[in-house]
A protein has these predicted regions:
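Hydrophobic alpha-helical transmembrane segments and their immediately adjacent juxtamembrane loops
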Residues: 248-343
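Divalent-cation-assisted or electrostatically stabilized phosphate/pyrophosphate-binding catalytic cores
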Residues: 239
Length: 343
């Protein structure tokens, strides 16, 4: 699908029977969304440029993402899509800056494009040429990444509360701070289930932050390349002034994303430490059982050998004596270990 945007006019889609050249002439922004081969050929003929293939857009070499052909600049950035879901994705978007218009090529519907279309419809007088459109799109993209990082920050705060069993903002608690008697087993099972969910959420958050950082890095290069190539172009003067601010925002957001990556690493290590602590508690229970039952088992084994010469076998109080000895051998080691603080 190809949509043509002329100054101060709504978008017009290319339909069968419509001349692509007629729609191209007044347009300052041409948006290609999942174009067909015929649409690409028609636009290439009308503009006299080469439209990159989807495979070429995915190439990671810098020379494949930022280059110049004739009077046109080709710049490809990575955008985060489906950021609100548990399965965010990344999609390449190519910006072709021509002397009098902007061509965008994409195979996804990122939120910034939706936001920018609404912004353009509300203030059409701000976007009189392709450079202004590019500046507006980049501004919308940065705003979206900032929103994603803000959302991630809130998610990390909630994850931190769950990990460290802190008081929730609403006055409640994710886990009982003081386990009630007789409910430690159920509480442990609840915590184990929570840890599994926490690990999953940390993984999803880490993936989203990684994609956001990739997007920020790619658009930092796009902005730097555009400013370098257009610094002497009078038509791009206003866009260059605005993109100077955008470049600063990109740097600050990249620093914030780096901070969040460090926080994610800390929370992951803390979660694994909590899981290890829970496992140590289980091992401790097994150790207590071994300390308590091993001595009585030894006593029972001695008196269960059934040798003929065993005085206790003919002793009337032999059986009670053995039982009392087994109880003492169980209680005494437990009391000693407890006093020493080993249990």
């Amino acid at each position: 699908m190809i949509t043509f945007y002329s100054p101060g006019a709504p978008g017009v889609q290319l339909e069968s029977g419509t001349s692509c050249a007629e729609l191209t002439a007044p347009a300052v922004w041409i948006d290609l969304f999942q174009p067909t081969t015929d649409e690409e050929k028609a636009l290439e003929a009308a503009l006299g440029i080469n439209i990159p293939t989807r495979e070429e857009m995915q190439e990671i070499e810098l020379s494949s993402r930022l280059y110049k052909e004739g009077d046109s600049l080709y710049m490809t950035g990575i955008m985060v899509t489906n950021a609100s879901s548990d399965n965010p994705t990344s999609s390449a978007v190519t910006f072709i800056v021509m002397p009098n218009r902007l061509v965008t090529l994409r195979y996804a519907e990122p939120q910034p494009f939706v936001s920018f279309r609404s912004q353009r419809q509300a203030h059409p007088e701000f976007y009189r040429n392709g450079h202004d459109v590019l500046a507006g799109l980049l501004d919308a993209i940065i705003d979206r990444v900032a929103d994603i990082l803000e959302s991630v920050g809130g998610s990390l705060d909630r994850i931190s509360l769950r990990i460290f069993d802190a008081e929730a903002p609403d006055g409640g608690s994710n886990w009982d701070r003081q386990p009630q008697k007789g409910k430690s087993g159920r509480r442990r099972r609840q915590r184990q289930g929570d840890f599994v969910d926490i690990l999953r959420r940390i993984g999803c958050t880490s993936d989203l932050v990684s994609r956001a950082r990739e997007s920020l890095v790619s658009f930092a290069r796009v902005v730097a390349y555009y400013r370098e190539m257009q610094h002497e172009n009078p038509a791009a003067r206003e866009a260059l002034v605005h993109l100077k601010t955008v470049a600063g925002d990109l740097g600050s957001l990249s620093d914030h994303a780096t901070f969040m990556s460090g926080k994610i690493s800390f929370l992951l290590e803390a979660t694994l430490g909590m899981i290890n602590n829970e496992q140590n508690g289980i091992i401790k229970i097994v150790s207590v059982a071994a300390v308590v039952f091993l001595p009585p088992t030894l006593v029972a084994s001695v008196y269960g050998m059934n040798f003929e010469v065993m005085p206790e076998l003919k002793w009337v109080a032999g059986y009670p004596f053995a039982l009392i000895l087994m109880v003492i051998s169980a209680v005494l080691p437990y009391a000693i270990f407890k006093r020493k603080g080993w249990l």
